[in-house]
């Protein structure tokens, strides 16, 4: 049976609507009928066919990894799921037999493959994933929010890596993940949450999500903002979401001694770092990849159930046939999360 899917068909800029064979389910898998998908920054990289994509993405391949859907098929070895369950899923498929997998640190599996990165993705009418990777969505969480659990998970994993209660938090990069991380920090009890960027549209989104200050670094000095807030000792926790070298070095300059930094943004491999700041301030830097399985997922659901409101971050909806408009909007930088409706 042929189904609709968005695929990377050619090694050049673009993504194409295609017909592909419906995926086949194994004994340990779930077959999911996709309801909504969201466009990730990774999908934009794949669309643009940048250096990372050229080195990573097999062509042709169905792309996409942010989704919510309904279980319509269950492998014979699977327990704990029923037809009709509403699910999203962990996009990192892990091996189960390396040291980290067996030690319960699944997110650090050295043999990880990615849905929509190096195996068939979710921008399709149907998706097959191992049942281990599926996460049931509580009834009170909307399809829209469930479809962005993957990037929300990046935000939660990054933000909750260190204690935030009563701390002053600096977030560099007001993309959707940075803004969600800021909202999480505020929700769990940080004191001042300051986010920096140069994109005024996204800084406005951050203001809607309740940050203490959203700072356009082209127009305002971080030091002046800290002074306005009565901060005398620098930031306690830094969340680097931009991959921008000047943003990271500004973070190092403005951290308190003993500060802690979570690093999610991917900088150029040859980024110059002022290591004196790291060494003499005794900074702790932690690299973040993906989500902790499945601690981050439980935290995500609980945060929303306890009143965290992410709805402002979802700014655009399109029918999947209008996917090109969705990608154009994401590439413009004048959007939060963009959702494609498959129903």
UniProtKB/Swiss-Prot annotation:
**Has keyword NAD?**
yes
Q: Which GO terms describe its biological process?
A: L-threonine catabolic process to glycine
Q: Binding residues for Zn(2+) 1, per the UniProt record?
A: 40, 65-66
Q: Where is this site: Important for catalytic activity for the proton relay mechanism but does not participate directly in the coordination of zinc atom?
A: 150
Catalytic class of the enzyme: oxidoreductase
Q: Where does NAD(+) bind?
A: 177, 197, 202, 264-266, 288-289
Principal cellular location given in the protein's record:
cytoplasm
Domain of life (superkingdom): Bacteria
Q: What is its EC number?
A: 1.1.1.103
Residues bound to Zn(2+) 2 are: 95, 98, 101, 109
Q: In which pathway does it act?
A: Amino-acid degradation; L-threonine degradation via oxydo-reductase pathway; glycine from L-threonine: step 1/2
Q: What does the UniProt keyword field contain?
A: Cytoplasm, Metal-binding, NAD, Oxidoreductase, Zinc
Q: Which cofactor does it need?
A: Zn(2+)
- Reaction catalyzed: L-threonine + NAD(+) = (2S)-2-amino-3-oxobutanoate + NADH + H(+)
Q: How would you summarize the oligomeric state and partners of this protein?
A: Homotetramer.
Task: Name the protein family.
Answer: Belongs to the zinc-containing alcohol dehydrogenase family.
State what protein this is by name: L-threonine 3-dehydrogenase
Q: Which gene encodes it?
A: tdh
